[in-house]
Structures are given as C-alpha cells and as structure tokens.
Amino acid sequence: MTFLMLAVSLAIPLLGAMMLLESPIDPQSFSFKEPPFMFGVLQPNTKLRQAERLFENQLNGPESIVNIGDVLFTGTADGRVVKLENGEIETIARFGSGPCKTRDDEPTCGRPLGIRVGPNGTLFVVDAYKGLFEVNPQKRSVKLLLSSETPIEGKKMSFVNDLTITRDGRKIYFTDSSSKWQRRDYLLLVMEGTDDGRLLEYDTVTKEVKVLLDQLQFPNGVQLSPEEDFVLVAETAMARIRRVYVSGLMKGGADMFVENMPGFPDNIRPSSSGGYWVAAATIRANPGFSMLDFLSDKPFIKRMIFKLFSQETVMKFVPRYSLVLEVSDSGAFRRSLHDPDGQVVTYVSEAHEHDGYLYLGSFRSPFICRLSLQSI
C-alpha cells in the first residue's frame, strides 16, 4: 500500500504537469479503412535489397532524381542542386545561403525537393522554403519563377513539395503541402491531419497561378498523365492518390485514383509500362500494426506524444520499411518491391526509372539506390 500511495503521489503531479504543457499540434480525428491485406501483388518480399547504394555518405537526402542522358541531377538536404556524373558530384545551384547543419538552418539554407527536366534541357526545381525555380545546368544560372513569399489566393506557401510539367514547358503543376507547417515539421503535419494543402498551376507565359484543388491533407508527389489530361496527387496523410483533370471534357473535375493504399505515398513517377511508380517510406501493415492508423482517431494521445517527445524521437519508433509500388494507368496495383526493415533502401521518397534501372531517392538517407529491373 505504501508503494501504491507513493506511485499515486508521484503520478498525480506528473499528469498535472503534462496537462499544462502545450502541444505543438491541434490534431483532428479521422479514420482509415482497414489497410489492404498484403498478399498477391502486395506480398512482402526483399526485392529492394537487390539495389546498390551510390554516392554513400556523399549525398544527404536526395529526395527527387532526374536524368539528362546518363547524367543524374538531384537536390540535397544541405540546400544544393547537384549533378552526378562518372562518380563525381558537382554543385550547379543553390537557392539559399548560410550554414545548413541543423533543422533550424533549413528555411535560410533552402531545401530542394521535386525536380524535373524541361523541354529545353533546363531543370525545374521546387524548394520547400523558397519557391519554384528554373536552373540551367550548363550555365549554372538560376531563375526564380515563383517565390514562396507570394500569397496565392490569400494564403502563403509554407511547404512547396513536388512538381510536374507539360511537354511544351508552359504549365507547371505543383503542391504546397501546407500553409501552416514547414518541411522540417512534416511529422507534425502528418500527425495533426491539417487539411490546408493545395495543388496549384503555374503558367510560365502569363505568370498566373491558380488553385486547382485545396483542403488536402499533406499533398505530396505529383505526376501528369501521358496524355496530359489529368494530374495525379499523392495525399500522403490519407494514404491515397487523387486525380485532377486539367484538360478535355473532364477539366475541372477530380476523383480518387487509388484509395486505401498499403503505405503512405510520396513521389509519383512514370513507369515504362505506361503506369506509375509510387514510393512509400512508411507502410500500413496488414497483418501487422500501423502506428498512424492506430493514432488517427485518438487526438488526445497524439497531443500528449508531442507534448513529451521531439519529432526526431518519435521518428525512431516509425518502422524503417521501404515500399515501392507500380500501379497501372487505371490505379490497380501491378507489383510491389519491399525492403521490410530498411537493410538497403531506407526512407524512400521516389522511384525514377531510367534505362532499365530504378533510381531510388530518399528524404533523409545519405545515398541514392539503383535497382536493376531485370534482376527482379
């Protein structure tokens, strides 16, 4: 009894202190459907472990990857856009300045995320903090197309994330994941369930910006269809991909392309089979346990977690399960590539197909992975 009384006497003031602490998030309650069973084309495997790591410990957070010929380009966590050729890394652009060592440096340093090749061999890049840029890789010149400081329909852009561009280079479709949360607080955005993300359209000729879809929960990767009639948008926090029609008879409409995915989707890129590659750094295991699914309708617990623990601490409890899905042009799962405990591929953010290989980006790993499609 004495021990019990002591425990209670300690617990009551501790709980009181916890209640007085402010939580950085005001989580909303929502619920997921039961995740799809991981069998058939979703059956867990170790195919991603056949990948090889490139530039290990020479690149930090190569989120998105493009190629011009056999030359690769990516953006890194220290604010650079780099060229990768013949085993060498060369910086071709920076959008920020100053030290780039901690999360507090990110807004000043800049953080290049989505990257695409335009029709004239220039690179179009979004920086999470700075906006939309065009980079000439030969001249090393940088042109600001749209600043994050520019309000769009009265709302600022706090987390510019990914982009996709028409073949003629006129229209750029891009995501702003939140007007409240910045990239460095992406876990708070996911846990809060903030629905202030948007899909936007930028016209490179008129400089006009339009909001195509709003009230999205962490809109992330985007991909224009081969016919350029719709744009796919990964709504990460809801484990789904939306389809927004941008031309043709359906223009202005939107529907669901893939619902109730087995992972939380990041970037979307075309596959040579006419479908799409979708990367997911966190899965919704079934059978198994998904922390995000469990917490989705428990805002009180989420609030308490972030009263007590930092984002980095919480990330340590997220399984390092990398998943790459290939989906058809109608949204059906074609195949899945797994690294169940992140032995080789970790924190995967994108699968970029080129010349028989998948080049796998990551939002926090210090390398790129390359996987031969013939080997799987």
Swiss-Prot record:
One of its GO terms (cellular component) is membrane. It is found in: Membrane. Keywords: Glycoprotein, Membrane, Transmembrane, Transmembrane helix. SUPFAM superfamilies: Calcium-dependent phosphotriesterase. Glycans are attached at N120. One of its GO terms (molecular function) is arylesterase activity. It is a single-pass membrane protein. The chain crosses the membrane at residues 1-17. Disulfide bonds: none annotated. It comes from the Eukaryota. Pfam families: SSL_N, Str_synth. Exhibits strong arylesterase activity with beta-naphthyl acetate and phenyl acetate. May play a role in adipocyte differentiation. Belongs to the strictosidine synthase family. This is Adipocyte plasma membrane-associated protein. The gene is Apmap.
